[in-house]
């Protein structure tokens, strides 16, 4: 009889990571539990049974086995296309399933109060708010050594470095993800990781979805979109899946 799954304790293996990050990210590094306490957000840590790596709408049809652990996955989308919302869905699914995760938030986009409906298990989240791309990459490299199941690097909307030096940097992060069996998701406005990314997902936003008819007030409920798998193992041609991104209730 197989042993019951015992989720790792929240952020139990992070002391060394926190020590490495405390200097360069002083005042901009928080555990989710601290964050929730400051914002008055309810803390929950109840595992869910659903596989967390297929949390994005439509992802299960594109990647039936889920996002690959130990690899670098790119999620690209322009401004206001739902990229950060998708990142929150992944973080919520992973932490609610009993996994530990980190968000390297270069755009400083996380608002704990508005993100609460996403269902993130805050005690299992490490949140870093670097101010520059160099800091964000260093924080990502450190987080990959922390025994986490998921690291999300959201690059916001800054100009991003390119060239051979950048390619070597992404390859190094991909190697670290593989070595530590961590899923590294790089969310950016456009492709940055080049050949280091084993899987590439592109998110495009369609029309806005409104509630209300006739003379009733119209309320924005979300947006239609399309998730396209443009690179993946044994992928012969891009595959797309329609999705709907709902605003938190």
Set out the residue ranges of the language-model regions.
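Fold-independent oxyanion-binding glycine-rich loops
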Residues: 78, 106, 155, 188-189
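Amphipathic alpha-helical transducer elements in NTP-driven molecular machines
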Residues: 56, 69, 84, 130-137, ...
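Detector for small/aliphatic-rich hydrophobic stretches
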Residues: 1-103, 248-249
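Conserved catalytic network of the ASCE P-loop NTPase/AAA+ motor domain
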Residues: 65-67, 93-96, 118-120, 142-146, ...
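Conserved P-loop NTPase nucleotide-binding/switch module
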Residues: 152-183, 190
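Hydrophobic/aromatic beta-strand patches that form the interior of the parallel beta-sheet core
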Residues: 73-75, 102-104, 126-128, 185, ...
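Phosphate-binding/switch region of NTP-binding enzymes
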Residues: 174-249
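Conserved inter-motif catalytic segment of the P-loop NTP-binding fold
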Residues: 89, 97-164
């Amino acid at each position: 009889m197989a042993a019951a799954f015992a989720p790792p304790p929240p952020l139990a293996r992070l002391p060394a990571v926190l020590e490495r990050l405390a200097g360069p990210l002083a005042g901009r590094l928080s555990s989710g539990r601290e964050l929730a306490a400051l914002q008055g957000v309810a803390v929950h840590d109840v595992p869910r049974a659903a596989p967390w790596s297929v949390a994005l709408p439509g992802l299960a049809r594109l990647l039936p086995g889920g996002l690959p652990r130990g690899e670098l996955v790119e999620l690209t989308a322009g401004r206001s296309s739902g990229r950060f919302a998708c990142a929150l869905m992944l973080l919520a699914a992973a932490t609610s399933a009993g996994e530990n995760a980190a968000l390297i938030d270069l755009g400083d986009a996380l608002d704990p109060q508005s993100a609460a409906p996403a269902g993130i298990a805050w005690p299992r989240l490490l949140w870093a708010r670097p101010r520059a791309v160099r800091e964000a990459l260093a924080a990502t490299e450190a987080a990959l050594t922390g025994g986490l199941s998921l690291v999300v690097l959201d690059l916001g909307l800054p100009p991003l470095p390119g060239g051979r030096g950048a390619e070597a940097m992404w390859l190094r992060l991909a190697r670290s993800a593989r070595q530590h069996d961590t899923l590294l998701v790089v969310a950016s406005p456009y492709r940055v990781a080049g050949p280091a990314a084993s899987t590439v997902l592109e998110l495009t936003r369609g029309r806005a979805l409104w509630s209300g008819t006739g003379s009733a007030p119209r309320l924005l409920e979300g947006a239609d979109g399309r998730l396209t798998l443009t690179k993946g193992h044994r992928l012969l041609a891009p595959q797309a899946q329609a999705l709907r991104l709902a605003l938190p209730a």
